[in-house]
Amino acid sequence: FREAAAAGHTLLPLQRCIFSDHLTPVLAYRCLVREDDREAPSFLFESVEQASEGTNVGRYSVVGAQPAMEIVAKANQVTVMDHEMRTKEEQYAADPMTVPRDIMEQWNPQITLDGLPDAFCGGWVGFFSYDTVRYVETKKLPFSKAPEDDRNLPDIHLGLYNDVVVFDHVEKKTHVIHWVRLDCYHSIDEAYEDGKNRLEALLSRLHSSNVPTLSAGSIKLNVGQFGSALQKSTMSSEDYKKSVVQAKEHILAGDIFQVVLSQRFERRTFADPFEVYRALRIVNPSPYMAYLQVM
C-alpha cells in the first residue's frame, strides 16, 4: 500500500479473499442493503448463458452498495454528491458525461494488483437514459423538442462504488474489495488504517450472525390468477400499430435505419422489486442480468 502511494497512486485497493460456499450474490446483496431500504443506491450484476449443452453460469457476479459519490444529470443541470467529503455541488454542463471523466482524471488508481479478479472491481455504475443522446445531437435533438417526461427521471445517474464484492464461481471464492482515496486523508498511514477498518466493516456485514432471511418465494407461475391482461398503457393497440407502419415508412424512405418503439404497461403491485428480480433471474436468465437501485 505504502509503496503504491509512494509511486504516485492516489486510489488504492485493499481486498480480502474468502470462501464463497456460505454466501450467494443474492444473499450478499441483502446483507448490504436492508429489505425496507428501497432507495439505497446499490447494484447486483450477474450472468447466465444458455448453451446447447445446458445452462452456464457466468464466472463472475458483482455486488455493490453505498457509493462514495453520485452524479445526477437532468437537461444539462448536474448535481455531484461526494458522500466521502460530505459535499454537494450543482453545475451546468453542456455534456454531463465529461463530469465523471474529469473527476477520475484527478486520481491515479492502482489497477494492477496480485489477487484482484479479472472482473469489474469498482468504479462507476448507473444508467444513461435514451435522452442522453440529446447531449450529443444538440441541433437535431434539442431538449426543447423532447417529449414530456411524466416520470421525472434523470438523464444520467451514476454512483462511484468504492466497496464491491466479486464472486468467482469457478474458483469458489469471493473477493471483498475497498478502494481508498488518499485525498480524503491527511497522511498515508491514516488512509491505510481507515481503509483496513472499512474493509473489516464490509466483511463483518457479510459474516454477520444476524444474516437476513430470504423468502422462499414460489417459482410456479400462473398469470391467470392475477386477473385480466394489462389494460393501462401509454397508447392503444391501434396507435401502436400505426407507429410501426410509420417507422417502416421512414426506414424505406432512408430517414432512419432502425428504431425502438416502446409501449408502457402499468399495474399496481405490492411486490418487492428485489423479489421480482429474484424470480426473473430464474424464469428468464440472460447473459446480462442487473438489479440497480437508486435514490
Predicted regions and their residues:
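Extended alpha-helical targeting/anchoring segments
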Residues: F1-M295
